[in-house]
C-alpha cells in the first residue's frame, strides 16, 4: 500500500474521472461518508481529460433522457454549490435530419423529451439558417432545437464533483 491510502473504506471507487467523481459525489450526498476514490495517476488523467463535455438532453430512451436532464440541472448548480468553476454554459443544440426516417426519429424524440420537461421544439429551415448561416437547407427534411443543451469542462466539472463529495 502507498503511504496515505487507507487500508479500508466503506466504498472504494476505482477511477478518478467524471464517472468515479459523480459516484463519490452522489454517495456522500446520500450520507455515505467513508468513500475512497482511487486513480492510477491524477484525477481526470484518463478518458475524462479527452472528453468533449457536451451536455445533451435528448437521448434514445425516456430513462436516459431523464438522467441527462438531471445531469444538466446538476451541472447548472454545481459551481454555485462548490464554489469551483465548471465551465458549464448553455448555448443550446440543433439536430437536423437529411431523410424521413431520421426526421421521424427526431419527432418521436421531441414528444418523449417533452414529457420529461426538456424544452425542445421543431424549427423551420429559415430559423435554422439564422442559427447556422452556412448550413445548406435544401436537402434537409427537418430540424429541432434544444435551447438548454450545454457544454462543460469535463476536468473542471470532475474537480467540482470531488470537492462536493469532500464537502458531503
Residue ranges of model-derived segments:
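Beta1/beta-strand and adjacent pyrophosphate-binding region of the FAD-binding site
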Residues: 3-19, 36
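Short, flexible hinge/linker loops that cap or flank conserved catalytic cores
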Residues: 3-6, 29, 88
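Gly/Ala-rich phosphate-binding loop of Rossmann-like dinucleotide-binding domains
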Residues: 24, 28, 164-166
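Glycine-rich FAD pyrophosphate-binding loop
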Residues: 28-48
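Dinucleotide-binding Rossmann-like beta1-alpha1 core, especially the glycine-rich loop
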Residues: 53-131
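Helical element adjacent to the flavin cofactor pocket in flavoenzyme catalytic cores
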Residues: 144-168
Amino acid at each position: 500500500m502507498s503511504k496515505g491510502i487507507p487500508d479500508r473504506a466503506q466504498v472504494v471507487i476505482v477511477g478518478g474521472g467524471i464517472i468515479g467523481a459523480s459516484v463519490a459525489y452522489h454517495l456522500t450526498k446520500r450520507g455515505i461518508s467513508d468513500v475512497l476514490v482511487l486513480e492510477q495517476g491524477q484525477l481526470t488523467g484518463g478518458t475524462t481529460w479527452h472528453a468533449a463535455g457536451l451536455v445533451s438532453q435528448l437521448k434514445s430512451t425516456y430513462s436516459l433522457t431523464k438522467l441527462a436532464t438531471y445531469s444538466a440541472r446538476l451541472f447548472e448548480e454545481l459551481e454555485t454549490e462548490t464554489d469551483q468553476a465548471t465551465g458549464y454554459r448553455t448555448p443550446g443544440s440543433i439536430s437536423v435530419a437529411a431523410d424521413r426516417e431520421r426526421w421521424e426519429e427526431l419527432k418521436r424524440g421531441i414528444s418523449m423529451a417533452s414529457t420529461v420537461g426538456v424544452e425542445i421544439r421543431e424549427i423551420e429551415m429559415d430559423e435554422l439558417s439564422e442559427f447556422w448561416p452556412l448550413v445548406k437547407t435544401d436537402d434537409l427534411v427537418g430540424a429541432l432545437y434544444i435551447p438548454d443543451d450545454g457544454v462543460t469542462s469535463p476536468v473542471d466539472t470532475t474537480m467540482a464533483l470531488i470537492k462536493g463529495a469532500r464537502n458531503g
